Amino acid sequence: LSFDQDEDAERNIVDNPHFTFVRSNFRYLKNFLRYHGIEQVDGILADLGVSSHHFDDSERGFSFRGDGPLDMRMNKRAGITAADVVNNYSEERLADIFYLYGELKNSRKIASVLAKARAIQPINTIGEFLEVIKPLFGREREKKELAKVFQALRIEVNHEMEALKEMLCAAAEVLRPGG
């Protein structure tokens, strides 16, 4: 079984009778194994990265190199967007997300400027988002810090930590001894 919650991944499906594509998050590993009549597996490979096409397509909202909707959802049909997070989470919760998932020392300042900006007008695009937060970073650190901010938002939007924990718990149950 191969899991990917992004429908765009279906374009890369291998035509092989031993391969089954599951358009879902790997957090549901145990459910789909049961559905396919599989009780145990010899190995599990989890790709925790983001595909380059996510960064290349500005309409997906994963990159600060272009403008488009502030989205960041791996599954375009589910969940909240990055704009939802930025516009609706409390300032404190935003700060926690930037600190925990982006390891940003100035997480409180980032959250504060976002809260002030969204009180005037909702932040819905990458361009609007960058206009608010870019002044917080020096030119020499800008790209590195923006990457951390975007990483933190992406992790929150897609509930990546929760999904990973669930998948690892399921993996411990279905992995054969010695697997």
Language-model region placement:
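S-adenosyl-L-methionine-dependent methyltransferase catalytic core, i.e., the SAM/SAH-binding region
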Residues: L1-G179
